[in-house]
Each structure stands twice: as C-alpha cells, then as structure tokens.
Amino acid sequence: CTKVETYEDTPTGNFEALWHIIDTKYCFLDYKAEEYGLNWNTVYRRYKRKIDDGMSHAGLFDVLGEMLDELRDGHVNLYAAHDVARYWDFREGYAANFSEEVQAHYLGTDYKIASALRSTILPDNIGYIYVPSVSSSIGEGNLDECLAALALCRGLIIDVRGNGGGNLHYAETLAARFTNERVLTGYICHKTGTGHSDFSEPQALYLESSNRIRWQKEVCVLTDRSSYS
C-alpha cells in the first residue's frame, strides 16, 4: 500500500500540501538548482513565514502564487475563482517580434482553412501554411487536402510564429508529412518516485514517416520567441 499524506484545509495545510506536491512530483528541481540555484527547502522556509491561519483566501493565493514563481516555469499555474497565478516573464520581459499585420498582408483574406491550418499560395508560386496553434485537431484528411492544393508550388513556408503549443500528437502528425524515414526526435524519462532524482532510464522518441501525402520539395519553417510548448 501507499501512504497518502493528508493536510488540514487551512492556510497552513494548503501551503504544506502545495509545497510537498512540488517537492515530490515536479520533475525539474535538480535542473533548476543547477541552472539558477533554486533550493526548494529554502523556498519552504521563506514562504512559510508568510503563512498565517487567519489570512484571507486571496492573501493565501497570492503567497502560493509567489512561491510557484520561484520555479520560473510557464507551465505551472495556480487556479482560483478570482484569478490565475502564472509565470509569464519568459514572454512579457521581451519585445514582441511577430507582426500580425505583416503576416495578414501575406496571408490575405482569400485563404483556405483546414482545421488549425491556414494556407494560401504566395507570389512566385510559394506555398504558405500558417499554424497558429496545435491545441486543436490537425487531421490526416486536413493535411491531405492542404498539401494536395499546394502540390504544384516550388517551395513551402510553414509559419509557426506565435504558436503557443498544445497537443504533441497534432505536431507529430504535421511533421510526419515532411520526412521519408523514421527520425529520432528526443528522449523521455518518467518520474518513478518522490525523490528529486527518481527517474526511469531515458526512452527514445521517434517520428514515423507518414504513409500518406508527403512534401518532397524545399520547405522553410518560420519560428519566433513565441513558438514553444
């Protein structure tokens, strides 16, 4: 059997619960310690002093949000009915470098929409596909139709600027149309215990080539600081 820690529904109890969840389940504590000196035990002592069982829900929310900010992780959020505590310094601390006006000029208004794909043919017979997100479905049929319509183009631009990510499966479905062979894309480890270094052995991740329409000509991928996740 597995022992499950229980905590009182008080500011102190909720603080303890959240700190321990991060301490035992968050994957990157050792990496953050090496990268910028994060010490999660020091974080505990620093923020424990700010907790009082008489504080308001909003006050507790603010302290817990500040504590999570120490992780410097845009994927770590705390939700409440009145607000979402988030870490957005990775993008708010930098000037925007993607102009929707310029992009709209090239995409125009007479473009095709196939699920998450926006496509058109630019001057000089260059195909253009804008992928603003991979949060919504990119189906095999969508890709068949899109690539077939651009088949006579002499080259292709895939624009993922401003793409805030989403579902890895949809990204792989798109990428599989641009390789004729199996490609090693990375490695993954799974958390196996409560210790900061408790991970499985790395497992290789491969992208399989699609058995449907694949692009065989030149292709250019446009990215920017907002292409992530």
Predicted regions located by residue number:
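Short, intrinsically disordered, charge-balanced linker/junction segments flanking boundaries
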Residues: S226-S229
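Short, conserved loop/helix-junction motifs that constitute active-site signature segments
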Residues: R212-W215
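Flexible, low-complexity junctional segments that flank or bridge functional domains
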Residues: C1-L207, E218
